[in-house]
Amino acid sequence: MSQEGDYGRWTISSSDESEEEKPKPDKPSTSSLLCARQGAANEPRYTCSEAQKAAHKRKISPVKFSNTDSVLPPKRQKSGSQEDLGWCLSSSDDELQPEMPQKQAEKVVIKKEKDISAPNDGTAQRTENHGAPACHRLKEEEDEYETSGEGQDIWDMLDKGNPFQFYLTRVSGVKPKYNSGALHIKDILSPLFGTLVSSAQFNYCFDVDWLVKQYPPEFRKKPILLVHGDKREAKAHLHAQAKPYENISLCQAKLDIAFGTHHTKMMLLLYEEGLRVVIHTSNLIHADWHQKTQGIWLSPLYPRIADGTHKSGESPTHFKADLISYLMAYNAPSLKEWIDVIHKHDLSETNVYLIGSTPGRFQGSQKDNWGHFRLKKLLKDHASSMPNAESWPVVGQFSSVGSLGADESKWLCSEFKESMLTLGKESKTPGKSSVPLYLIYPSVENVRTSLEGYPAGGSLPYSIQTAEKQNWLHSYFHKWSAETSGRSNAMPHIKTYMRPSPDFSKIAWFLVTSANLSKAAWGALEKNGTQLMIRSYELGVLFLPSAFGLDSFKVKQKFFAGSQEPMATFPVPYDLPPELYGSKDRPWIWNIPYVKAPDTHGNMWVPS
């Protein structure tokens, strides 16, 4: 497959067919990632997506920018290129080859480039010392940056002054003021949050050695349950990672529908003092907590219900029962223990609604329990109708895109948008086409000028095979920009959805979730609209003004602004209104090369 665009020419062989066209948020691989040096067996090993593999490969052996075409072999070019998409497909590959079977496990060397502060103009080339061994630099980087916030007063962050308890992760390489109210995983697991008794970590990707080191030394031997979706070789690799740790047990989430993933990211933290729930967007690997924009919701510290009392411990948002229902969907004995723990705690102070997805085919009232129908039900029951609602846009922001069909009517602007448009019991759904839809997904230029450079695109696994089938979608795309939080150059792995006012000064609701823009994550109707089919596990929290005694939230002008703004202003982590792609912008596609311009480390992107 020969292609050409603003960022260079390339060829993709049929063996590079990506599983991204399958409807799932991240593409699992059975690859194990190892650091190739003495003692490699002791380095982190974890399964990840094909896109993440490519990013790791280019961190090991970056391809330095060159003004010549000598890097790539001569290519055939088809006449009548898709100029509007920026890609040109050779005629011999117009029909995609059948999907290749999942590759067998292979070992890939990892190297992390030494962190360098953000570029002044976004185009400056980076230079670095390549003399040190790759894994030595990785260790230096982790030691230097994986410490909790210096001088950060955790108590100030957890006090009642922040009604939303919505945070971003710390980003290495931004000004300190943009990390002053952000959290690292070490902060979350800190003794300041509670005296840990045991914990459960729900996630997609695990680096077990790294994870254990994020716990304080005094908590590292406390029981840890890892809830994952790995199968076959990937499962074997995860078990091998966990084997040295007697306190770690594993729970495999059942994934009975093809191409589903366990994408949920949640921590259950049981303390001597109570229980805390953390719902977030980061994989449990170093890169996800380093230079990306990620979201975190922290629950209050839930006290234990005194024995002999008949208090339910339920919140006005029904969070306790909904969390238990979500955990019961796993049908796993090891989670029954955590369900019992939750039953014994008072969750009544919770002010968010839980929105989950679990694999299955749901009919009747069960259809409203999960996915976009769950969002629709909550918006119907608890959101306030707005005058001129048809002029209130819908915003979706995500880090991957599934296959959404031949045109917008197949899913995006039919069932999905209809759920997003719901506002109150009496509100009529406005004409679906009349409500503006803003989709935020990083452009190639966003990735090129990011702190990580092109390897940031390893966590944005939108493939050419999927993208070329839905050119119509990209007219909705808007750039990533986050001056409000100092994260314009920290590529987003966070996923958010919201309903802002026409002038973007207010929002009717805000959702932070693990769910990307895919049918696998949100569900798709079957059987003439009577059945909702979901492939994956996802989890997020919905902020509704009614739970805070409000009709709408005002948007906070600066994400990290202090007490000068009213308490009830909501901290949206990126800039509003979103900026539409320019005529030369293209969505980031992970599995094609970009060789015409260097990234912030002076490198090109040649993924294979």
Curated annotation (Swiss-Prot):
Outcome after substituting residue 495 to A: Abolishes hydrolysis of the covalent intermediate between the active site nucleophile and DNA
CDD domains in the cross-refs: PLDc_mTdp1_1, PLDc_mTdp1_2
Active-site residues, Swiss-Prot/TrEMBL: 263, 493
Subcellular location: Nucleus; Cytoplasm
GO terms for cellular component: cytoplasm; intracellular membrane-bounded organelle; nucleoplasm; nucleus; plasma membrane
Enzyme class label: hydrolase
Residues the UniProt record annotates as site (Interaction with DNA): 518
Function noted in UniProt: DNA repair enzyme that can remove a variety of covalent adducts from DNA through hydrolysis of a 3'-phosphodiester bond, giving rise to DNA with a free 3' phosphate. Catalyzes the hydrolysis of dead-end complexes between DNA and the topoisomerase I active site tyrosine residue. Hydrolyzes 3'-phosphoglycolates on protruding 3' ends on DNA double-strand breaks due to DNA damage by radiation and free radicals. Acts on blunt-ended double-strand DNA breaks and on single-stranded DNA.
Protein's recorded name: Tyrosyl-DNA phosphodiesterase 1
Organism: Homo sapiens (Human)
Gene from which the chain derives: TDP1
